[in-house]
């Protein structure tokens, strides 16, 4: 399930990054096409998660933050601060609790 969260986050980040390139960096308007595709894939991927939507969105939020921090480090090439790392660890712990809770507690 963790891999599905990561792929979902990458699709969403790409869907936001392409408009950033168009509007902020002056890149080609043709990037609206992969923007639409990325966001459509993102929405489709959300439907593949096997739990109630609210629980998925809550857990996904933590994985999204982790993925965004990896994007910051490796795509934007900005060094993470100790606050970035600590915040990432905290939200991953929270997402992990939601994702890995005992199945008997889930309705």
From Swiss-Prot:
Give the transmembrane region(s).
Answer: 2-22, 28-48, 56-76, 85-105
Q: What is its main location?
A: membrane
> What membrane topology is annotated for this entry?
Multi-pass membrane protein
Can the keyword Metal-binding be found in this entry's annotation?
A: no
Where is this chain's protein located in or outside the cell?
Cell inner membrane
Gene Ontology cellular component terms for the protein in this record? plasma membrane
- NCBIfam families, A to Z: PRK02237.1
Instruction: Identify this protein by name.
Output: UPF0060 membrane protein A1S_1909
């Amino acid at each position: 399930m963790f891999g599905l969260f990561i792929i979902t986050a990458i699709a969403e980040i790409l869907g936001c990054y392409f408009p950033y390139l168009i509007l902020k960096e002056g890149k080609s308007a043709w990037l609206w096409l992969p923007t639409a595709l990325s966001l459509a894939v993102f929405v489709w991927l959300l439907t593949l998660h096997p739990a109630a939507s609210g629980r998925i969105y809550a857990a996904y939020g933590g994985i999204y933050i982790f993925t965004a921090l990896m994007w910051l480090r490796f795509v934007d090439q900005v060094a993470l601060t100790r606050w970035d790392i600590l915040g990432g660890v905290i939200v991953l712990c929270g997402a992990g609790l939601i994702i890995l809770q005992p199945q008997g507690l889930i309705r």
